Amino acid sequence: MATTPTINRNRRSNEALHPDRPWVRVVRVLLGLGTLAAVAWNIYRAATGLSESSVIESCSHFTNQANVVFGLVVLCGAVRSRKTLPSWWDDLRGAAAFYMVMTGLIYALLVAEPGELGRWDLDPANIMLHRVTPVAGLIGWLLITHTRKQGWGRPLAWLAFPLAYLIYTWV
């Protein structure tokens, strides 16, 4: 399966931030494992009664679902060569980054208690899932090179999961 070459925005930055570079892979593996560990910790806390949520409620949170998608996308992108990824990979990567940005914004604007955004004495999983991954998702999308140019219509497809989740929560 052939893919198109990466977009040459700036040759020097394109080579430095190529997803197949070893240091980019290491960062992505650590981020992916940290993200999935934070979600697993949330589910473990729910299963053992350490949180107010049940396991089903914890698995139903958009934050946890979006972070699982993001963690898997980051890990798969880290362990597989860019040339072996399918042509739709950038769309999935873009959707995961979009979900992370939405998670961060909704947390910051609607969910966090007043004054909580300035505190760092929170549960590490909370910090990872609501602060680190949203910022990392945005930075990764902006800086890691893409395999093809993105049309303006593609982000509309990324809305499918959040809209389905919204309908699910309303029903």
Predicted regions and their residues:
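Aromatic-rich, lipid-facing transmembrane alpha helices and their immediate juxtamembrane interface loops
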Residues: 2-171
